[in-house]
Amino acid sequence: MEYNTSELCDMYLDVVDVVEPMFSNYGGCSSFGGSISTIKCFEDNGLITDVLQEDGQGKVLLVDGGGSLRRALIDGTIAELAVSNNWEGIIVYGSVRDVDALEELDIGIQALASIPVGADGNSVGEVDIPVNFGGVTFLPGDHIYADNTGIILSPEPLDIE
């Protein structure tokens, strides 16, 4: 489904939180949204791989990677896993790699930057907890909408019809 965050802000500005503009699009889908699952990890993507093995229909994985630009939390293999399990998108407060492969995949991916160095895979971190970055607190189950213009968050799904 296509989302236009500008139009959604015009209709729901009193309901949504707007994430500070710092993200770039790396996936093949420039517009995506859904109910969020959260992960907090630092330079380690083991938990990301674990969570993306679950059915992601209607969900967006939101990763608080501490804003690290030193290690990529998402790569082509992890993104392919997300696609195969029907995730709508991934938002990473951190870095990605394999950007040419990511842009070919049918999934939305936004991150701060790209870097060729991969992350550790020790599964260190926390899942389904509140996380805060970009001036917004994200709670598991909140609804997120993203496009090339920005990212917005709502406690309930927005009526976009």
UniProtKB/Swiss-Prot annotation:
A Pfam match: RraA-like
| UniProt xrefs under CDD domains | RraA_family
Superkingdom as given in the UniProt entry: Bacteria
Cited NCBIfam families = NOT-MenG, PRK09372.1, RraA_entero
Check the record and name the PANTHER family matching this protein.
4-HYDROXY-4-METHYL-2-OXOGLUTARATE ALDOLASE 3-RELATED, REGULATOR OF RIBONUCLEASE ACTIVITY A
Its subunit composition reads: Homotrimer. Binds to both RNA-binding sites in the C-terminal region of Rne and to RhlB.
What protein does this entry describe? Regulator of ribonuclease activity A
Q: Which organism is it from?
A: Shewanella oneidensis (strain ATCC 700550 / JCM 31522 / CIP 106686 / LMG 19005 / NCIMB 14063 / MR-1)
